[in-house]
């Protein structure tokens, strides 16, 4: 995907538990992750519920939410210049269902990305700024600005 016009990329995930076709979903734990790879696709680092911060890349995860009866979100901020400085080129987003509930069996589930010109603004995300749509394939961003 073409890089946004900013130095900070935010991946986000929002979901809600509840009834689907008259059945309760029960507890739903979804996990948002980002993995960084080098020019030749060697692993550089990852950000997830198992690694909330990467000091060398100035990236951070909002924290692990393990249930969403009223709705919940997770997000990851990626400093694209620091990724490049650490030898990273490609940033790949992924989502896992820790509790095994399929995404299609949730009343609401959204995932997307947005660029952030002011990462410390306190703004979480919004449809006008983000690309809030289901990914048809696993997206990755080339920090050198190439399309993928």
Give the ranges of each region predicted by the language model.
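Intrinsic-disorder/low-complexity signal
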Residues: 1-148
């Amino acid at each position: 995907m073409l890089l946004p016009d900013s130095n900070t990329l935010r991946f986000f995930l929002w979901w809600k538990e509840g009834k689907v076709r008259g059945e309760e979903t029960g507890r739903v734990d979804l996990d948002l992750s980002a993995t960084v790879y080098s020019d030749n696709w060697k692993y550089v680092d990852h950000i997830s519920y198992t690694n909330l911060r990467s000091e060398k890349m100035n990236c951070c995860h909002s924290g692990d939410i393990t249930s969403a009866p009223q709705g919940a979100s997770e997000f990851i901020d990626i400093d694209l210049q620091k990724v490049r400085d650490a030898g990273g080129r490609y940033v790949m987003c992924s989502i896992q269902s820790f509790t095994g509930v399929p995404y299609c069996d949730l009343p609401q589930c959204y995932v997307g990305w947005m660029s952030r010109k002011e990462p410390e603004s306190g703004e979480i995300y919004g449809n006008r700024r983000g690309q809030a749509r289901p990914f048809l394939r696993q997206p990755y961003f080339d920090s050198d600005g190439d399309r993928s």
